[in-house]
């Protein structure tokens, strides 16, 4: 068959399939109903705990809610500090009000009906589900561009089995991570919509929006810009127009979002960990370079590659020379001590090799899963089974693979990005099995379902953990009879996160609490107290002093308490299977204050005042302490 005949035949087949799909397509309302129903069923207990007890999964969610409350109470748009953290200076934060905005709007709208407190909880349930629905709608649109025969229900099936990523959309997950996932797929959809001027322009705008919200996606955006340049080098369809439109979107994003994110007086201030003149300069240089490449009429690929490399290297070099303090990345300002003792202990900030060496080789399963799907996608495009629209999807998969060696959390994004390839393979399997003469439809469905099991990521994790069980520590196993009463309750979190955990502390006169790091934000939400610290890197001295207090010996801990002058000390007991050993350069673990608190051997200058059955141990500082 000649290429022209193949193209006509393929176009005819696509149009026929598209007509058939449109005829049986479920309505968006029906899809929305099933997604919301899934959320209610899968997260029934977390939703119940959120509405009845204000429970959320992560300290960042509590601090986000506290930020929203502060803003609604009159704190300025540009002022995202936390006055009740690390007093008297206040907690310095790099967060964005852009995430606070929809949560605050929902809270205000619901307050007349439910009251302020319940309105905030309902808003915390609605917002993640809304972001999930938008993410799934974007994924469906991506799959339809890559494979016109897409069944939306199949997209939802593969997406909702990505348990690791789905946890970011659970009720109460109101911090920015789920929005960042959504923005990645909006960028991808824009790149796949090259024939529409809004596609690449929207992708460029979303790059800046993502950076304005947080720098989580910074490495991804850098590699995505590199992919766009490579598409121009190899003269892919609409690549030139894509560069120009992406540049326009970036410029528009900078013009709109930078003034919304940074007050005029700080436009020239250098901040390595948030949108600042550093990243504005880098993105503006990239946009200028893209615009220049778009007008270059070089036909030689080697020349194109050299020019694209010059643009990329030039933007990086100029930024590095102009802002040397940020050459080490967003966390350049952190001290070596804070990086070694605190940042390095954040598991998701580690690469896959380090993560797997600590938690077991079974964690390589998702890496292998994505590699195989990437290879399958390349074969589909090379054999023209799938169109070139799949190429941006494969680029995102490759980017996630590269980033996983820096941060393991890139894999959960990669599993989401692999959904279009899974949809295509599942559809091809159905067509193969249903085309066999004499085979019943039920048998074809069974064979397709069996094949689809290998495309579902949790199956890989289950098998990998069965073959390569994670390293265990016999000391980690708690005897049921020895476990405290609070730990026997259903759905107990790894952190203190219910209002009942803080009910006693809330009755005490307001004062400064020297707290374990994970508990600080919840104390701000559930009580009127101030806290010394939370896991927020700009407050490095407070973080280290808190770690030293609980991990050091009595003499060192007392010096810290004397310097900080707290009225209370609060320590959330960890789950019996997760007794901590906080890294510290001072003192020994066995005689640390944290260990002694857990063993009931606290020093005399700490007077236990909370009920013995409470999970949150609350102590009053003795008058001479």
Where are these regions (language model features)?
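Start-transfer (signal-anchor) and selected internal transmembrane alpha helices
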Residues: 1-48, 153, 295-312
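Membrane-embedded helix bundles of polyisoprenyl
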Residues: 34-42, 127-145, 151-195, 199-233, ...
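Active-site lumenal/periplasmic loops and adjacent helix-entry segments of GT-C-fold
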Residues: 44-145, 151-158, 162-183, 210
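Transmembrane signal-anchor helices characteristic of membrane glycosylation enzymes that use polyprenol
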Residues: 22-61, 66, 73, 80-83, ...
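Signature aromatic-anchored transmembrane alpha helix within multi-pass, membrane-resident enzymes
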Residues: 308-313, 430-470
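Extracytoplasmic
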Residues: 7-15, 457-625
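Juxtamembrane membrane-water interface segments that cap and precede transmembrane helices
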Residues: 84, 110-117, 260-274, 331-364
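Membrane-interface helix-loop-helix junctions at transmembrane boundaries of multi-pass membrane enzymes
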Residues: 236-244, 298-308, 324, 367-395
């Amino acid at each position: 068959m000649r290429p022209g005949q193949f193209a006509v035949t393929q176009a005819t087949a696509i149009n026929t399939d598209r007509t058939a799909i449109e005829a049986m397509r479920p309505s968006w309302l029906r899809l929305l109903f099933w997604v919301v129903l899934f959320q209610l069923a899968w997260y029934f207990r977390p939703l119940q705990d959120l509405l009845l007890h204000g429970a959320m999964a992560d300290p960042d969610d509590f601090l986000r809610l506290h930020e929203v409350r502060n803003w609604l109470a009159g704190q300025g748009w540009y002022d995202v500090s936390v006055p009740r953290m690390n007093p008297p200076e206040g907690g310095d934060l790099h967060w964005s009000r852009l995430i606070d905005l929809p949560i605050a709007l929902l809270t205000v709208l619901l307050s007349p009906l439910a009251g302020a407190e319940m309105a905030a909880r309902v808003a915390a349930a609605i917002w993640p589900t809304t972001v999930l629905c938008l993410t799934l709608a974007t994924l469906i649109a991506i799959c339809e561009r890559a494979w016109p025969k897409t069944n939306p229900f199949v997209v939802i099936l593969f997406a909702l089995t990505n348990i690791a990523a789905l946890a970011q959309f659970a009720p109460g997950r109101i911090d920015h991570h789920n929005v960042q996932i959504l923005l990645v797929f909006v960028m991808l959809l824009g790149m796949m919509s090259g024939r529409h001027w809004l596609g690449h322009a929207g992708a460029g705008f979303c790059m800046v929006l993502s950076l304005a919200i947080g720098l989580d996606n910074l490495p991804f955006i850098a590699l995505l810009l590199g992919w766009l340049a490579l598409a121009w080098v190899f003269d892919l369809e609409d690549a030139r127009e894509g560069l120009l439109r992406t540049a326009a979107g970036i410029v528009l994003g900078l013009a709109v979002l930078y003034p919304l994110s940074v007050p005029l007086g700080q436009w020239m201030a250098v901040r390595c960990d948030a949108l600042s003149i550093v990243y504005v300069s880098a993105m503006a240089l990239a946009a200028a370079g893209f615009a220049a490449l778009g007008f270059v009429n070089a036909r030689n690929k080697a020349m194109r590659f050299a020019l694209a490399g010059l643009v990329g290297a030039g933007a990086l070099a100029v930024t590095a020379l102009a802002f040397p303090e940020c050459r080490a990345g967003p966390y350049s300002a952190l001290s070596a001590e804070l990086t070694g003792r605190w940042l390095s202990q954040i598991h998701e900030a580690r690469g896959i090799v380090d993560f797997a060496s600590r938690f077991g080789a079974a964690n390589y399963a998702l890496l292998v899963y994505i590699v195989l799907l990437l290879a399958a996608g390349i074969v589909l495009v090379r054999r023209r089974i799938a169109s070139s629209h799949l190429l941006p999807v494969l680029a995102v998969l490759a980017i996630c693979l590269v980033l996983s060696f820096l941060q393991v959390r890139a894999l959960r994004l990669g599993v989401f990005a692999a959904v279009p390839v899974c949809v295509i393979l599942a559809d091809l399997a159905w067509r193969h099995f249903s085309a066999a003469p004499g085979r019943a439809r039920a048998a074809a469905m069974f064979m397709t379902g069996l094949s689809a099991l290998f495309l579902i990521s949790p199956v890989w994790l289950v098998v990998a953990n069965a073959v390569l069980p994670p390293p265990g520590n016999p000391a980690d196993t708690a005897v049921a009879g020895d476990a405290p009463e609070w730990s026997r309750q259903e759905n107990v979190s790894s952190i203190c996160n219910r209002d009942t955990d803080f009910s006693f502390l809330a009755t005490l006169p307001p004062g400064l609490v020297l707290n374990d790091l994970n508990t600080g934000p919840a104390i701000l939400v559930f009580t009127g107290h101030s806290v010394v610290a939370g896991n927020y890197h700009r407050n490095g001295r407070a973080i280290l002093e808190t770690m030293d207090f609980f991990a050091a010996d009595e003499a060192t801990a007392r010096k810290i308490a004397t310097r900080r002058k707290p009225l209370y000390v609060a320590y959330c007991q960890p789950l019996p299977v997760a007794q901590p050993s906080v890294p510290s350069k001072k003192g020994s673990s066995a005689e640390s204050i944290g260990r002694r608190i857990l063993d009931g051997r606290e020093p005399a200058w700490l007077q236990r005042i909370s009920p013995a059955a409470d999970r949150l141990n609350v102590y009053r500082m003795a008058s001479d302490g």
